[in-house]
Amino acid sequence: MAIHKKEEFGRKKQHLAMFGRAIAHPARISILKILAKQENCICNDLVQRLPLSQATVSQHLKELKNCGLIIGTSYKTSTIYSLNKIILKEFESEFKKMMKSLKSKK
């Protein structure tokens, strides 16, 4: 019986990998930084602050939202984006644990 790769790794490791993929692009890091400074933004706010097209910003927002790092709330004809602070704290905690374990393995 074949074992799927996802089954070989724990849920926390899968989430850390998903987080890593989500922040692996400089545009996504920029979006997260903008949202940290200005809590609620619509896509157009981000387009005005980044050297990217609306379609590209939308794609990056989709990736961040799929990972759970940001929340999108519908308001009239727009979506308002903000950081998901609960998920960010979880990722921070898991990342710190991972880094600590890597440093202690000499």
What do the predicted segments below correspond to?
Residues 1-16, 36-37, 85-106:
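Amphipathic alpha-helical dimerization/coiled-coil segments
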Residues 14-53, 75-87:
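N-terminal helix-turn-helix DNA-binding core of bacterial DNA-binding proteins
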Residues 48, 65-66:
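Alpha-helical residues within the helix-turn-helix
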Residues 60:
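Residues within the DNA-recognition helix of helix-turn-helix
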